[in-house]
Design a protein with these regions (language model features):
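Short acidic donor-binding/metal-coordinating loop in glycosyltransferase active sites
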Residues: 71, 117-118
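Radical SAM/AdoMet-radical enzyme domain recognition
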Residues: 95-116, 123-237
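Cys/His-rich zinc-coordinating "finger" modules and their low-complexity flanking regions
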Residues: 52-58
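Radical SAM enzyme [4Fe-4S]-AdoMet core and its adjacent flexible, acidic
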Residues: 181-305
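Canonical Radical SAM [4Fe-4S] cluster-binding loop centered on the CxxxCxxC motif
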Residues: 38-49, 61-96
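Flexible mid-to-C-terminal extensions adjoining Fe-S/redox cofactors in radical SAM and related proteins
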Residues: 1-46, 50-52, 301-380
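Exposed loop/turn and edge beta-strand positions of beta-sandwich/beta-sheet ligand-binding modules
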Residues: 28, 65, 109-111
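A short, flexible beta-alpha/helix-coil linker loop
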Residues: 49-50, 85-89, 179-181, 240-242
């Protein structure tokens, strides 16, 4: 990886602003300039050798780009680290609105349709929604791949898993986390959900863990070893300052990788670098032959848009274009959680296929968004 000019966000007003990644004596810095709030300088990596060796190489690795649509603001958990603040009193998006988004906000090259939330499995009509999405994709001559991004609790119900499998769910992504967040009973349900998906023929694309405490790392790695090939990939993420997560451990990606490598060396586990889309936010390895994606998200202070020209592509914020997941959750946090009214535009090169998609939201009002809940603190 090399130093380069890029685009970042002003963490005060959330405008997109010019930035530059620069190597200094103490590590890699992101220096950005907001027209209103001036210059800011943040250290984004301390290990210069690690930074210089990061290589974007997908020759041996294929990841579906995917398009992600929020289908509900409700959730059956209240995870303290989540970027999404659930509202169980709100009304779910109408199925027609979700179908409109899929047809009009994304093109055929996007890949699988990923249903997200808060927690999509709390929708009582989810099987029917999946059926209608499959029918739409068939009509549009697109791949009929529907995926659910879930906390996995509802998956502990085998009969319900059978319903979504028969409706057309092809795969799931499970954010399981360490049991310190939700307790061991919830964790056991999530583990049962993995077994049920496998039994009903639903592919477990990944199981993700967010750590509340770095001391939990070894326990998480041991659980992944016990799960083995039940998931195609396992993701381990330390916290970042997005949404409700100020108390999570925050450190650099090289520290994260080294911590896991030290545990593997001590336990005698094999460590093999896997070619992938490595950057300052994620790093791929195989541990005892099992694929691990080691993740360290940026936050609004350190976001580097040059590293986010990829999927999954998301449509989370009314009136804003379709962009990368991490970028979207920051904008969502600003609009919904913090009450900013964002008038800033997103630079074209970071949009999802701008030459093919009309991003103007003109044919549908975002009925599921209750404007009274968004306290308009600032107009940007």
């Amino acid at each position: 990886m090399q130093d380069t000019k890029t685009i970042s966000l002003c963490h005060i007003c959330y405008r997109h602003c010019e930035a530059e990644r620069v190597t200094k004596e103490d590590g890699i810095h992101l220096i950005k300039t907001c027209p209103e709030h001036g210059v800011s300088d943040y250290l984004v990596e301390t290990n210069k050798e690690f930074y210089n060796n990061l290589t974007y190489d997908k020759s041996g690795y294929s990841i579906p780009q995917g398009i992600m649509v929020e289908v509900t603001d409700k959730c059956n958990l209240n995870c303290p680290h989540c970027y999404h603040k659930p509202d169980n009193k709100t009304t779910d998006k109408p199925i027609e609105q979700i179908l409109w988004q899929i047809e009009n906000r994304f093109s055929a090259e996007a890949g699988a349709v990923i249903l997200a939330g808060a927690e999509p499995t709390v929708r009582k009509d989810l099987p029917e929604l999946i059926k209608q999405i499959k029918a739409l994709l068939k009509k549009l001559n697109r791949p009929e791949d529907v995926c659910i991004l879930t906390n996995g609790v509802k998956l502990s119900d085998r009969k319900w898993v059978k319903q979504i499998a028969e409706a057309g769910t092809r795969m799931v992504m499970i954010g399981m986390n360490h049991h310190s967040y939700q307790g061991k009973k919830v964790h056991e349900k999530q583990l049962k959900g993995i077994e049920n998906c496998i039994a009903e023929g639903i592919f477990v694309y990944y199981v993700g863990y967010t750590l509340e405490n770095l001391e939990h790392m070894e326990e998480v790695l041991e659980e992944i070893q016990s799960l083995g090939n039940k998931a195609w990939q396992y993701r381990i993420r330390a916290g970042s300052d997005i949404g409700r997560s100020p108390d999570e451990p925050q450190f650099f990606l090289s520290d994260h990788v080294q911590l896991i490598k030290d545990i593997c060396d001590r336990k005698g586990w094999t460590w093999e670098k896997e070619p992938a889309d490595d950057n300052l936010y994620h790093y791929m390895v195989k541990i005892n032959g099992i694929t691990h994606r080691i993740i360290q998200w940026s936050d609004p202070k350190t976001i580097d848009m040059e590293q986010l020209q990829c999927g999954p592509w998301c449509d989370f914020v009314p009136g804003k274009p379709v962009t990368n997941f991490l970028h979207q959750i920051m904008l969502r946090d600003a609009v919904v959680n913090e009450g900013y009214n964002l008038h800033d535009t997103v630079p074209t090169r970071y949009l999802f296929q701008p030459e093919q998609v009309d991003y103007a939201v003109t044919e549908w009002t975002w009925k599921s968004w209750d404007d009274s809940k968004v306290k308009q603190k600032k107009s940007i």
